[in-house]
Amino acid sequence: ETATKTVKAFRSEISKKHGTDSIFSVFIAVDEVPEKFEAISSGHFFYTPSKKGLGETHRSEMKSILENWSVNSKEEVLSWLDGFCKLSTYEISIPVLKDRDLAPQGKTGLIVSTLFEYDIVKKAYESGWYGELKEELEKRIIEVLSNSIYPILKDRILFSFSSSPLSIESYSG
């Protein structure tokens, strides 16, 4: 019985916590044959568009944005997001390259994920522009990939949707 109480107390305490790094994922449906993507990359890999990477500058800028959220404009946050997307590392998965039955004939689906700070998404939600942040992040990720590894991407997108750290939290609790 003591062990049960300890476990319940631990569960209660841990349920109030959250991590800092989480995942932002975008699914992109593309009107393009898988072979075009296969000529560029494998079905699963990590990609960083810039050798510079995020590094300490990014972390200090992000910390400043979070600490000054109430005085920063939305435009300042979105400007920071531009730099983030250009320097981030992406995990890219193209399931149809492993199994052609995983997409309609002549179509390709990409799953693109990157680490993303939970607190930024949470603050955007609390400020009333969570949906816009998701759309802007999705748009910037697609733009970065279109301007680098996948120039075929931009004009061939059928649809896309994303999940943020808050999406993950809502499903996992």
Language-model region placement:
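A glycine-rich dinucleotide-binding beta-alpha-beta segment and adjacent secondary-structure elements
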Residues: 84-95, 147, 151-173
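Mid-domain catalytic core of redox enzymes
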Residues: 1-103
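Glycine- and acidic
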Residues: 23, 120-130
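Short, well-ordered amphipathic alpha-helical segments that serve as non-catalytic structural scaffolds
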Residues: 140-144
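Activation-segment/catalytic-loop signature of the eukaryotic protein kinase fold
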Residues: 134-137
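Short coil-to-beta-strand
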Residues: 105-114
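Short connector loops/turns at beta-strand edges and beta->alpha or beta->beta junctions
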Residues: 115-119
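Hydrophobic, well-ordered secondary-structure elements that form the walls
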Residues: 28, 112, 145
